[in-house]
């Protein structure tokens, strides 16, 4: 099962998933289905569903600086998903997430602490409050993880804001391998 849309609000105006829908998805994974996805299509989906978040192992919180340059650090070079991949530079949104400590983390990124955090405003509100995120300096954030739930497997990669990023060699290789891993 692959969530193929970018954000949950494409399903409904509020980005909701019905309880019976998420319950059926959980049952499918528990019984051996694989679930894989990337970026906001998986971890910024269904913000109101705690069961969805618990299943996939994380929830997007912010991407200070918007599109920015950062390094993806491979944490486990012995895994089939990351085999032969070295640390690499990346240009996109760097996700700050709430993540399950039970995830098997395969790659991370580190925040510099100089990112600009722009607060969301009410529609029509002029200006924007901004802050420098010095408190997240050196925070190591998972970028790729996998997990097993029941008989099923879940794979997630936070990269891929723009479709062209799917052509990035390292991202493409690990995403492809992760999809295959989750499907077996």
Question: Positions of the model-derived regions?
Answer:
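Glycine-rich loops and low-complexity Gly/Arg-rich segments
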Residues: 5, 9, 28-30, 60-64, ...
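A glycine-rich, often tryptophan-bearing local segment used as a flexible ligand/cofactor-contacting loop or short
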Residues: 7-84
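Structural recognition of the beta-strand scaffold that forms the well-ordered cores
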Residues: 1-5, 29, 34-38, 105-107, ...
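Short, solvent-exposed loop/turn segments at secondary-structure junctions
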Residues: 7-8, 42-44, 110-113, 149-150, ...
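Extracellular ligand-binding/catalytic regions of CAZymes and related secreted enzymes
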Residues: 56, 115, 123-143, 148-184
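Short flexible/disordered coil segments
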Residues: 41-50, 97-103, 126-132, 175, ...
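Catalytic beta-strand/loop cores that center a nucleophilic Ser/Cys/Thr
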Residues: 64-150
């Amino acid at each position: 099962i692959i969530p193929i849309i970018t954000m949950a609000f494409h399903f409904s105006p509020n980005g909701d998933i019905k309880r019976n829908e998420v319950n059926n998805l959980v049952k499918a994974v528990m019984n051996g289905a694989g679930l894989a996805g990337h970026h906001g299509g998986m971890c910024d989906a269904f913000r109101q569903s705690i069961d969805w978040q618990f299943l996939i192992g994380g929830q997007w919180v912010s991407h200070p600086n918007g599109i920015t340059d950062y390094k993806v650090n491979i944490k486990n070079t012995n895994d089939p998903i990351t085999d032969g991949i070295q640390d690499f530079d990346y240009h996109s949104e760097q996700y700050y997430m709430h993540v399950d400590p039970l995830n098997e983390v395969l790659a991370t990124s580190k925040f510099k602490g100089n990112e600009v955090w722009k607060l969301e405003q009410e529609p029509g509100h002029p200006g924007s409050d901004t802050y420098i995120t010095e408190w997240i300096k050196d925070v190591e954030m998972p970028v790729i993880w996998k997990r097993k739930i029941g008989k099923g497997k879940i794979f997630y990669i936070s990269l891929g804001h723009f479709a062209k990023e799917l052509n990035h060699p390292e991202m493409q290789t690990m995403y492809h391998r992760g999809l295959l891993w989750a499907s077996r």
